[in-house]
Amino acid sequence: MTNIRKTHPLLKIVNNAFIDLPAPSNISSWWNFGSLLGICLILQILTGLFLAMHYTADTTTAFSSVTHICRDVNYGWIIRYMHANGASMFFICLFMHVGRGLYYGSYTYMETWNIGVILLFATMATAFMGYVLPWGQMSFWGATVITNLLSAIPYIGTNLVEWIWGGFSVDKATLTRFFAFHFIFPFIIAALAMVHLLFLHETGSNNPTGISSDADKIPFHPYYTIKDILGALLLILVLMTLVLFSPDLLGDPDNYTPANPLNTPPHIKPEWYFLFAYAILRSIPNKLGGVLALVLSILVLILMPLLHTSKQRSMMFRPISQCLFWILVADLLTLTWIGGQPVEHPYIIIGQLASIMYFLLILVLMPMASTIENNLLKW
């Protein structure tokens, strides 16, 4: 008799995705981040659900309800900090996952890659709306500044912003709708992640060499299930270390002050995972130009398959491209640092140079390096 996992309509799907899936025999730890992102998402949905049971989306009580969760709810503090720091772990995994895709040329799987970019946008939107919910100073002013950027859109800008706000400023209507969206979005992300996986399984996984691995496949279980479990344990170890030893390390002290529309904090800045994009936004002295640069800094990922000029898929055997890739990583770290600094000399010029460097590397230098490598190999 055939095993039930191969015949049952539901188990068959699980079997083909996680058990009998033919996987390349040489995928490294950089291929662990997909499963880690899945774990992060499940963790965020569960902790978020329990937080939503005690949270109230009202301007007068939101801040107090978060305090109440931390002080009075059984293990509320750990749920709250797991959710807040879980978002940071989520973005660390996301950046690693995208970086892996860029390095090993995974973007040549067009459908998988494009859904991935949509997932990145959706996750960023969700995190932004979640940051508004505790209704601290940085929540309120972050929401005001970022939503206000839409007013740079010609003709419809102002109407669009007021429509999103549900009034003439960030207020009760804004908070309630952000809570509603923040609750629904993770489920949309989960659905998109399943589509992401569906498209990936149409082609099979890429591998570090970028060469077809059809001649050398191994079953996903037990080899990669055990590898994913190790990754998950390390993820939970790092997360719980953060939560139990320094839960506020990545947060902003201003968010422990209740939102006050009459008092602007001296330095308005988003969470650390948005700082690179915030630095690019601030480096352009024009409002519309800044907004366009901000959107393009992420949207440029969609162009990656078009900018791929190399005859090889992966960067494994391309030292010049490797060098430029790590310069890009260093550039993004520089932008992240600049995004958290005040707008004054010398930070302004550093931010502008780093922003120019970012687009120059992706749009010009990396495609050029690929062409040079082709010529060096007489291809």
From Swiss-Prot:
One of its GO terms (biological process) is mitochondrial electron transport, ubiquinol to cytochrome c. Its main location: mitochondrion. Heme b b562 binds at H83, H182. The chain crosses the membrane at residues 33-53, 77-98, 113-133, 178-198, 226-246, 288-308, 320-340, 347-367. Gene3D superfamilies: Cytochrome Bc1 Complex, Chain C (1.20.810.10). It comes from the Eukaryota. A ubiquinone binds at H201. It is found in: Mitochondrion inner membrane. It is a multi-pass membrane protein. Binds 2 heme b groups non-covalently. GO terms for cellular component: mitochondrial inner membrane; respiratory chain complex III. It holds the Pfam family Cytochrome_B. Keywords: Electron transport, Heme, Iron, Membrane, Metal-binding, Mitochondrion, Mitochondrion inner membrane, Respiratory chain, Transmembrane, Transmembrane helix, Transport, Ubiquinone. Heme b b566 binds at H97, H196. Heme 1 (or BL or b562) is low-potential and absorbs at about 562 nm, and heme 2 (or BH or b566) is high-potential and absorbs at about 566 nm. The cytochrome bc1 complex contains 11 subunits: 3 respiratory subunits (MT-CYB, CYC1 and UQCRFS1), 2 core proteins (UQCRC1 and UQCRC2) and 6 low-molecular weight proteins (UQCRH/QCR6, UQCRB/QCR7, UQCRQ/QCR8, UQCR10/QCR9, UQCR11/QCR10 and a cleavage product of UQCRFS1). This cytochrome bc1 complex then forms a dimer. Component of the ubiquinol-cytochrome c reductase complex (complex III or cytochrome b-c1 complex) that is part of the mitochondrial respiratory chain. The b-c1 complex mediates electron transfer from ubiquinol to cytochrome c. Contributes to the generation of a proton gradient across the mitochondrial membrane that is then used for ATP synthesis. Belongs to the cytochrome b family. This is Cytochrome b. It comes from Cephalophorus niger (Black duiker). The lineage of its organism: Eukaryota, Metazoa, Chordata, Craniata, Vertebrata.
